[in-house]
Amino acid sequence: MSSNFEPLLTDLIPGASHWSMVIPKGHTLRLKDVEGGANLSVLFYNPKNLLERYNAPDTLKCQHTFKLTTGNCLYSDMGRVFASIVRDDTGWIDTVTGVANKKKVADKWGDRDYQHERNHWKQNGYDALLVEVAKYGLGQRDIAANLNLFTKVSTDIEGMMHYTPEHSKAGDIIELRIEMDTLVVFTTCPHPMNPATDYPYKPVEVSVAKAAPMQEDDVCLNSRPENRRGFENNRRYHFTADLLTH
């Protein structure tokens, strides 16, 4: 957790919106649920090689978990750590249920109509991510399985998935320590399993600050032996990159 968090940048992502930024390694990304009940769908890419992106199966498999929370790392498909979860007030981050598409949102909340609703339209998470990644030359084939921050989806003994309404409370914070230069892509569109009667517009505040150097007793480094190997992959990647730039 960042005890002396001094933001270099702060922004507010309105509900039903999308946002992205390349965040350099050595920074902490703080995400705050402003009103409670937010959902923040997230994708990660290597801005220097956009073919490298967040890999959900490897992230879960190597850490032997279905959920993510404080102490977990977020892996690329090259076995490197994009980010470490150093704070999670919610205790559970959804990893498997993805985003809603146009039909899902229309069936649940009605057709979107930008002509009349403008920026208060009923956008869906899939199209929102597509719009944002297109800014970097990416498209449909580049939309991988995403995370849903501030959202909890659990399973029962028979394997049925259950959405927890209002899992995140107003003011809840999740902090990600960025371990390599990372393109972060967000959308605040509602979760596909959200049972709300009316389309929920829930904003999320984003802040970026310098991160303290990782110590040997770091919770993310030590939560799984596999994470040590992930950080070693990062070290070798940055070692090679530094050689090539000198």
Predicted regions and their residues:
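Intrinsically disordered, low-complexity segments enriched in small/polar residues
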Residues: 1-246
